[in-house]
Amino acid sequence: ITTCWSDWSRSVEDAFDALSQHMDAVFVGGLSAGAVLSLRHAQRYPGRARGLALYSTTLRYDGWTIPKLSFLLPLILKTPYFGKRYRFEEAFPYGIMDDKLRGRILAQMQSGDAAAAGFTATPGASLKQLWGLVAAVKRDLPSIKTPTLIVHAGNDDIASARSNALYVRDHIGGPTELLLLDRSYHMVTIDQERNVVGDATARFAWNLLSDAERERLAAVAREPVPAAPETSAQTPDAAAPSPASSVAEGMEKAAEGAGR
C-alpha cells in the first residue's frame, strides 16, 4: 500500500472543495470506511457539510462472520512477517442478503473487476491505516455537531450495529437519525432495502434545506433537458429528465411521503 489514511481523508476534502464551488449545500456520506472518512471530514471542517450520511459505519469489525479471535489481529500485524503478508478475506455472505445480487457481485469481485465491485480481500497494511483513522475519529467524536443520518443493518455480518452505529449515535455531538434495517447485511446501499435507504437519505437532506433551496430543487425537477441527437440506435421521442432532475424529484416525493 502506498497511501495512508491522511491521504484518504485529503481526497474527501478535495472532492468537497470541488463540489462546494458549484453547490449551495453539500452533504458528505460514505459506506463502511467511507462513513468513517465522512466523520473525519466533519471533525476537521466543522459546519461546512450540511449533513452527514453514514452507511454501515465500521469502527470495529465484529459482525457475525468475523472470527472470534480477530481482536488479536492488531498484535499479529505488528510482526514483520504477518504485517506484510496478511490479507483479510471476506466470507459468505459478503455483506449482501439478496442471493441473486450476491452472485453477480461475487463474480465481479473474483474476476478482479475492483472498479465495479471492490476486492474480496483487504491487505493488512490497509487495515492498519483504517485503525489509525478510527482512533483519530473516536478521540474527538463529541466535537461533531453536524446533523447525521446513521443507517445500519440490524444483523450486519461485518460490523455490528451495537459497536458501530449505536456507538456513533451515543457519542457524536450533534443531532442524529438512526435507521436500522431488517432485510440487509453490510452493503446497505445495494441490498434488498436500498430503496428504503435512498428514501431516508433524500428525506434527511430535504429537511436540512432552506425553503429557497427546496424551491430551486423542485424547479430543477420540472425542467426537461434537450433530447440527445438522433442516432441509428436511438430516436428519442421527447426530452428525458436529467439525473439531477430525477434526484430532485425523488427528494421532493420522499419529503411529501414523510409529511403524510
Question: Language-model segments: what does each one mean?
Answer:
Residues 182-237, 241-260:
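Catalytic active-site module of serine/aspartate enzymes centered on a nucleophile-bearing elbow/loop
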Residues 33, 37, 44-123:
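Alpha/beta-hydrolase-fold enzymes
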